[in-house]
Amino acid sequence: MQSIEDIWQETLQIVKKNMSKPSYDTWMKSTTAHSLEGNTFIISAPNNFVRDWLEKSYTQFIANILQEITGRLFDVRFIDGEQEENFEYTVIKPNPALDEDGIEIGKHMLNPRYVFDTFVIGSGNRFAHAASLAVAEAPAKAYNPLFIYGGVGLGKTHLMHAVGHYVQQHKDNAKVMYLSSEKFTNEFISSIRDNKTEEFRTKYRNVDVLLIDDIQFLAGKEGTQEEFFHTFNTLYDEQKQIIISSDRPPKEIPTLEDRLRSRFEWGLITDITPPDLETRIAILRKKAKADGLDIPNEVMLYIANQIDSNIRELEGALIRVVAYSSLVNKDITAGLAAEALKDIIPSSKSQVITISGIQETVGEYFHVRLEDFKAKKRTKSIAFPRQIAMYLSRELTDASLPKIGDEFGGRDHTTVIHAHEKISQLLKTDQVLKNDLAEIEKNLRKSQNMF
């Protein structure tokens, strides 16, 4: 029996003999076999830049090698890290199903790149990492559920998969299930349509660790929330570990049932914020080392200073620089990096909205001094503009709730939540407020040259 991983490793060995080392290291080294769906061999690339290049340049080349190895003509599909999160991952069973050619099919494994050893720890994710490791070492005994929230590409999925890998390696016969809430919803709807709700429930209520991503997409789906509520209760009562991720804390997920919200708050809630400069440099160094790349320190510093949004874009920028260097056959320097990234740096740097910028713009609009936003004054003429500024800070920046609270005179994160909820409700009926906010955002973008 050949697994898809075995086939892919054999494929890579042939590819390596037919490509220059710089090209191989740039385009192929970080790829992995993702899954086999019917006659389609799915390959995972580290980011969309590499994915697009592979699709354009190497699809037929890879298909020919796969046919040479297996005697079978496959369709080849490439996906990137973000697309991977829409797939279901489960633990491979001891006797996996085989297709007619003896190739392992069906279930998808946890992403092999997402383990604790490859996770770079920094100030913005240290607590989330520690909590995830504690849960991995003692499932259902440390924090249950563990709720991790933060923006796109900051490492939530990485930590969830790392827990899954750790449990697999240290707990014999442990059943680990990873999926997105969208996948849960779609399967639930299909089970109702096909009269297979019992099979659906058996599948998700008989695992040792349930990892469910992007739970915010359950908002507004009453039937799915009902089903997940009972799934949660069953697993919790049987002392099975539940880990949930979201782009926001439970209190901020709209139209989420209170009973689910309260259960999400039973365990530990931790956030992940964008990496600081030191962490971004460390991420680039680790990525370069893992891919066998020799990147000058000044180049990594340049990239880290330019790309401060999330890890996915940071690593994508590094790959872009390396690829550009290979294509133009020039050494990697800070100047070359600037040339390679010129199309993406303007959008990532000039369009950053800051809390201080929001405070200044709202203050000018309502004739409120900046110091009043941070003061303890509660008069309506100050409190209401302050709430608007908090609302905009939550909507237009990646800052965490505690960070926003700090910028408004050290206020508690619950104050920020209250302000956001209040303005959100008023916007549903108050046309004057809608007009005010539209004008404020227009002024804000003008002040930061965002046209």
Swiss-Prot record:
SMART domains on file: AAA (SM00382), Bac_DnaA_C (SM00760)
CDD domains: AAA, Bac_DnaA_C
GO molecular function: ATP binding; ATP hydrolysis activity; DNA replication origin binding; lipid binding
Region: Domain IV, binds dsDNA, residue numbers: 326-451
Primary localization: cytoplasm
Coiled-coil annotated residue ranges, if any: none
GO CC entries: cytoplasm; plasma membrane
Location(s), subcellular: Cytoplasm
InterPro entries in the record: AAA+_ATPase, Chromosome_initiator_DnaA, Chromosome_initiator_DnaA-like, Chromosome_initiator_DnaA_CS, DnaA_C, DnaA_dom, DnaA_N_dom, DnaA_N_sf
Residues where ATP binds: 153, 155-157
Region (Domain III, AAA+ region), start-end ranges: 109-325
Region (Domain I, interacts with DnaA modulators): 1-72
Keywords associated with the record: ATP-binding, Cytoplasm, DNA replication, DNA-binding, Lipid-binding, Nucleotide-binding
Region (Domain II): 72-108
GO BP term, example: DNA replication initiation
Highest taxon listed in the record's lineage: Bacteria
Domain notes: Domain I is involved in oligomerization and binding regulators, domain II is flexibile and of varying length in different bacteria, domain III forms the AAA+ region, while domain IV binds dsDNA.
Assembly and oligomerization: Oligomerizes as a right-handed, spiral filament on DNA at oriC.
HAMAP family, sorted: DnaA_bact (MF_00377)
Family as reported in the entry's similarity comment: Belongs to the DnaA family.
Protein function: Plays an essential role in the initiation and regulation of chromosomal replication. ATP-DnaA binds to the origin of replication (oriC) to initiate formation of the DNA replication initiation complex once per cell cycle. Binds the DnaA box (a 9 base pair repeat at the origin) and separates the double-stranded (ds)DNA. Forms a right-handed helical filament on oriC DNA; dsDNA binds to the exterior of the filament while single-stranded (ss)DNA is stabiized in the filament's interior.
Protein's recorded name: Chromosomal replication initiator protein DnaA
Organism: Listeria welshimeri serovar 6b (strain ATCC 35897 / DSM 20650 / CCUG 15529 / CIP 8149 / NCTC 11857 / SLCC 5334 / V8)
